[in-house]
Design a protein with these regions (language model features):
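N-terminal lobe/hinge region of extracytoplasmic solute-binding protein
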Residues: 20-26, 41-94, 125, 204-208
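Bacterial N-terminal signal peptides
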Residues: 1-12
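Acidic glycine-/aspartate-rich tracts in secreted/extracellular proteins
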Residues: 47-48, 106-107, 164-165
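A generic structural motif
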Residues: 99-102, 155-161, 222-225
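Extracytoplasmic/periplasmic ligand-capture domains
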Residues: 16-32, 78, 104-137, 147-151, ...
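Small-molecule pocket liners
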Residues: 40, 69-71, 99, 220-222, ...
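Surface-exposed binding/hinge segments that line
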Residues: 137-189, 215-217
Length: 363
């Protein structure tokens, strides 16, 4: 899916050229100049549950949120390098404890409201609040101590870490910056986790990504339109994205996804099984199959090591005791025939993994 969306944002089709405000500091992308207009339809196996990054836990929601929101810095998934994004620059103190980020000037949320350091402070305040239960919170804790954030001016924010962390820049990728002007009141009322349902009116939700909400039809589709305030342009100054619309069709059957793709109803499939890859390769018509190589995603099995409660059953207590034994976990790992899974489930289109770093990660 990652490769699909990289292609979407670079493909020559959508954002009408607009006049740039001289005070706006855009991120200019190199490469071939595209043309404006068009839409891409993507089939999803499951309907997303929310547009709220604070509670999104399942893949469909996170995929859609990913094109509606933006990060302070960006990790290029192809090169694994850290790149500028909402922050145009950053500086690290000699002791590695302080990160000073400078925002691009003149940036706006998808509803036209300006972005500044107060939005960043508000965002991290929300993520760190235990009562919000944001999944991002654990990333911002170091041995139980939270990262601290302070504003220097409207464009400059200082982050202080409790201890040095070699890849701290990556903390700023994957943390969507929230619109304080829309969310501060519900946050203070303890209702921020209730926001961002799919039925949310488009004018009540905003992000910093290339697309914004346009339409939702339950059980059928979710339509996003290009963000007219997006902060990236091509080399000629045309505001991106090129696409006018990005449409997600809810197609729960994998076979139905293939049929819709072959009929031209969709241009992308969010997840493709090995069986359907073979079908599309065998019946290839007016489309091209490309092997993009190994990705960064992987499937894994993990053990529940949480502390038992007062009502934990005797059987669960025994299982937790097993899980805490290193030799038991090693035995389970050794018992899994990874090569057979690759051969039988993925038809050879996968790789056995014995650690946390997938073969697609070349660094």
């Amino acid at each position: 899916m990652l490769l699909a969306f990289v292609w979407i944002l670079a493909w020559p089709v959508a954002a009408f050229p607009q006049q740039k405000n001289s005070k706006e500091e855009f991120l200019v992308l190199p490469g071939e100049i595209g043309r404006s207009g068009g839409r891409i339809a993507v089939s999803l196996r499951a309907e997303p549950k929310t547009l709220n990054p604070l509670i999104a836990a399942e893949t469909p929601s996170r995929e859609i949120i990913g094109v509606m929101q933006a990060d302070l810095v960006h990790i290029n998934r192809a090169t694994q390098l850290t790149e500028t994004a909402l922050a145009k620059s950053w500086k690290i103190s000699p002791d590695g404890l302080q990160y000073t980020l400078v925002l691009r000037r003149g940036l706006k949320f998808s509803d036209g409201f300006p972005l500044d350091a107060d939005d960043v402070l508000f965002t991290f305040q929300v993520y760190l609040n235990e009562k919000v239960h944001a999944p991002q919170r654990d990333l911002l804790l170091f041995e139980g101590k939270p990262i601290s954030v302070r504003k220097v001016d409207l464009q400059t924010i200082v982050f202080e870490l409790p201890k040095p962390y070699g890849v701290a820049e990556r903390l700023f990728d994957g943390l969507a910056i929230l619109p304080k002007h829309l969310l501060e009141k519900p946050y203070e009322e303890g209702k921020i986790g209730q926001l961002g349902t799919l039925a949310t009116p488009p004018n009540q939700w905003a992000g910093l990504g290339p697309f914004r909400l346009k339409e939702y039809v339950a059980g059928q589709r979710l339509v996003l339109e290009s963000n007219p305030y997006y902060w990236k342009t091509d080399a000629k100054g045309n505001r991106l994205p090129y696409l006018d619309e990005l449409v997600f069709l809810f197609v729960p059957s994998a076979d139905a996804q293939v049929l819709r793709f072959q009929s031209g109803e969709t241009e992308l499939i969010s997840r493709l099984s090995a069986e359907n890859f073979s079908v599309l390769s065998r019946e290839q018509k007016d489309y091209t199959m490309v092997d993009a190589g190994p990705g960064l995603e992987y499937n894994f099995l993990f053990f529940n090591l949480s502390e038992p409660g007062e009502k934990t059953s005797a059987r669960t207590l025994q299982e937790l005791k097993w899980f805490r034994e290193v030799k038991f976990r090693q035995a389970v790992s050794a018992a899994i025939d990874r090569e057979a899974i690759v051969r039988l489930v993925y038809q050879g289109r996968g790789s056995a993994l014995w650690g946390l770093v997938p073969p697609g990660n070349r660094r």
